[in-house]
Amino acid sequence: MTRFWIGVVSKEHVLRGVEGGFCQVCHGKKAPLNRMKKGDYLLYYSPKYQLNGQEKLQAFTAVGKILDDTAYQVEMFEGFVPFRRDVSYYQPVKDCPIEQVRQHPQWRQYASQIRYGHFEVSKDFFLYVFEQMKLDSPANQ
């Protein structure tokens, strides 16, 4: 059964993942990544542009499909070897501001989970956000 997830990551880091065809969540932890299975979908929510920056973004910034079966490690720099998963990202998309998503009836249920960095959402919620992100969507005409 296909499941749908949100990962909370700065936009700067999301863009690295999109460019490289991978995802990382929760500062490279393995457990959250292994909750996802091949064929699951991931939406990235970016509270800020940069991890240590002050400028807020508060938007959904990428959407993709998990391609592999398990998390693997990659050394990004000496002493930091995070886990990641391979992802096929849907492109092009536009950022979807949180204000658009707050209209969805399930938003209140998910809003409090953002602080956990990675959590499952319903297919209906996922599709609602995804539709807002697609450039060719009637929602964006």
UniProtKB/Swiss-Prot annotation:
Domain of life: Bacteria
InterPro entries: EVE_domain, PUA-like_sf, UPF0310
Pfam families xrefs: EVE
Protein family according to the UniProt entry: Belongs to the UPF0310 family.
Protein's recorded name: UPF0310 protein SSA_0254
Source organism: Streptococcus sanguinis (strain SK36)
